[in-house]
């Protein structure tokens, strides 16, 4: 006699539970304590969050937030972050880091954006920001008709959002077409001083502008306080701005003075507007639709050399090319790595760890760890090291700003048109700094 076998199908019910997003770390939690997102978990998170993101539409309508995040004001950005914090019960979000326009926020790129918030939290916010940008993609009109954007978005913020800065924080490995700029292309098309002037906001996000400059009791440094007015081709000479004083102890070494210079130069560029802005993207530098280049038709009058000629405070026992002054001259906002390197290279006291080799614009990092430490101090990033610094240098390869010298360790060369920008030949700088040709 055979035993009866129960072949009835069974239904297994899996209980689902809401993800506890309060597990997100606080800002003071070490990164090592936070598990990294894997590609598969990121994909699952992306799919799970898309439906929830749709709830932001009602919030946009209620608060009058534009659909295009590149048109957001600082208030809109704050409202968006606050909505996300409440919607997902996010923890550890520092709202001060998001004090910027939507255009500046979108221009950061993923790598820099993720530095604004703890792990997981930054991924959620970035995912939503990307979706919002893709939902509001609008084609440019090139037949003479004006685009549908409001006139107000042709300010410098609009320039930032659709300019070359939009690609600044994306390392070459993240491009979907990594070979869209070849070595031969770089050789045949060196970056011009005008293109160099257009590069902004790479490797860092804009700092919050201080209302009152820091007060210290030593070394005075001039700065320019720019009035909130439209810069036309006739009044773009930066020397027309009113002058003030900013005190800064050990101004080329202290973190506080670095931050104040960043904020002042950020104020300089963010309060400007370019009537002559090239509104239709140019693809001369990039053959990729997500990274259009937009350049102003006019650059500041004269060279940097002319700009600092009458400023005696910049000529005595200081770098020939202070990064803060160069950032102010170019209107680049926060100090950029290439500007910082030029400051160190034109400071005699730094020749023990970074110096010109004597061969044109070639330079060597004799102590790369010290260079990285100072860059981290300048940007208030104590975890900065040479590995991270070198990633920033590699980013410059495709931009034709800096190239690595083949066969030489820690040796690089500026390949952009520095002479037109600075007004100095490399030989002039070498003579001023008593540079002896490298024996290697």
Swiss-Prot record:
Residues 130-243 are annotated as: Activation domain. Keywords: Acetylation, Cytoplasm, DNA-binding, Immunity, Isopeptide bond, Nucleus, Phosphoprotein, Proto-oncogene, Transcription, Transcription regulation, Ubl conjugation. InterPro entries: Ets1_N_flank, Ets_dom, ETS_fam, Pointed_dom, SAM/pointed_sf, SAM_PNT-ETS-1, Transform_prot_C-ets, WH-like_DNA-bd_sf. SUPFAM superfamilies: SAM/Pointed domain, Winged helix' DNA-binding domain. The keyword Kinase does not apply. Residues 418-422 are annotated as: Helix H4. SMART domains: ETS, SAM_PNT. The modification Phosphoserine is found at residues 251, 254, 267, 270, 282, 285. The modification N6-acetyllysine is found at residues 8, 15, 305. It is found in: Nucleus; Cytoplasm. Phosphorylation at Ser-251, Ser-282 and Ser-285 by CaMK2/CaMKII in response to calcium signaling decreases affinity for DNA: an increasing number of phosphoserines causes DNA-binding to become progressively weaker. Binds DNA as a homodimer; homodimerization is required for transcription activation. Interacts with MAF and MAFB. Interacts with PAX5; the interaction alters DNA-binding properties. Interacts with DAXX. Interacts with UBE2I. Interacts with SP100; the interaction is direct and modulates ETS1 transcriptional activity. PANTHER family: ETS, PROTEIN C-ETS-1. This is Protein C-ets-1. It comes from Mus musculus (Mouse). The gene is Ets1.
